[in-house]
Amino acid sequence: MPKPLFHGVCASSITPFGSQGALELTRLGPHLDWLIAEGVDAISPLGSSGEFVAMECEDRKKVLATALEKIAGRVHVVAGTHDYSTRRTIELSQFAQSHGADSLLIVPPYYMAPTPSQVMDHYRRIAESVSIPIVLYHNIPLTAVDLKTDHLLKLYEEKAIGGIKMSNPEPDRICEILQATDSQLHVYAGIDTVAFEGLCHGAHGWISGIPSTVPRAAKELYVAIAVEKNLDRARLLWTKLAPLMRLQFQAYHSRGEGAHWFSTMKAALNMIGPPVGDPEPPIAPLPESLRGTLAKLLRDLGYTVKS
C-alpha cells in the first residue's frame, strides 16, 4: 500500500557536481542529513534545485538511488522523474519506485509545448506504469504549459495525479482547487513569493527554494500557519524571510541581470551547511559582491555562517 502524500515543508535537494560535470555523490549524504536535521518533512531529489536538466538519464538514476539509500525512510521522498519524453519519464519513475520512493514529482513536457490533451495523456501513461502518487509540477513560466483547473481536476478524478506543486504566482488557484476537491487533492505552494498566501488558503505544504535553502526558518513559518494558526507570529516570520526571497528571485522575476535564484541557494548552503559546490554552467556562482549581503541575511534568520 503506497504511503499517503505528506504535509509540511519539502526541500528540493541539490546535486553536487565536480569538475567537468562529474557527480560527487559523496557530498550528497551529508547534505541530506543536514536537511533532515533542519526539520524538513520531505525531500525531493532531482527537483529544479537538483539540476536534472543538466544530467543524463543514467546520472539521474545514480542520484535517485543514492538519495533513497541515504534517506532510508527517515522522511517522505518525492522523487523528481521528469523528462520531456514520456518513455524516459516512465523509465525514471519505475526506477524511483523500485528503489523506495514514496511519490513522484513530474513537470509537464517542456520546450515543444504539447497541447493540454497531450500533456494529460503524458500523466495518464505514467500513472498507469507506477503505483505511487504523482505530484504534478505546475510551472507555467518554465514550461509554457498551462493546464487549467478543469484539466487538473480531471486528472485527479481519474487518479492520474495525487497532488500538485503550484509554482505560479496564483494563490487563488490553490484555494480554488482545494475547495473543488474538499482538500483531498494535495496542493503545495511551489513559489516562495506567494507561499504565505497559499498556506493561509490551506495548502498542504511548501516545496520551493526557501525550504531548500533555510529549511528551519521555512518549517517555523509552516507550523505557525498550519499548526498553531498564529498569524501574528507567521507575519513576523514572513517579514524576516522576505529580504532573502527578494535577493534570491531578483533575476527570476525581472528576467534581467542580478542574483540567480539557484546561485543564491547554493551559495547559502555552502555558508551554513555541508559544502555542495557551485551550479553547473551556464548558471554562474553567486558574484562576490553579493556574498556579504547573503551572509547577513542568513545571520538575521539565526544561522551561523562559516567564515
What do these predicted ranges mean?
Residues 29, 61, 65, 90, ...:
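Generic alpha-helical structural signal
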Residues 81-82, 108, 112, 137, ...:
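Glycine- and other small-residue-rich loops at beta-strand/loop junctions that grip anionic moieties
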Residues 74-75, 133, 162, 184, ...:
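Secondary-structure boundary/capping positions in well-ordered alpha/beta enzyme cores
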Residues 5, 10-14, 38, 203, ...:
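C-terminal alpha-helical cap/extension of soluble enzyme domains
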Residues 128-129, 140-250:
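Catalytic alpha/beta core domains of metabolic enzymes, predominantly
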Residues 23, 30, 58, 62, ...:
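Conserved active-site and cofactor/substrate-binding residues in soluble primary-metabolism enzymes
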Residues 2-146:
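Active-site beta->alpha loop and helix N-cap motifs at the rims of alpha/beta catalytic domains
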Residues 38, 62, 66-71, 95, ...:
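Alpha-helical structural signal in soluble globular domains
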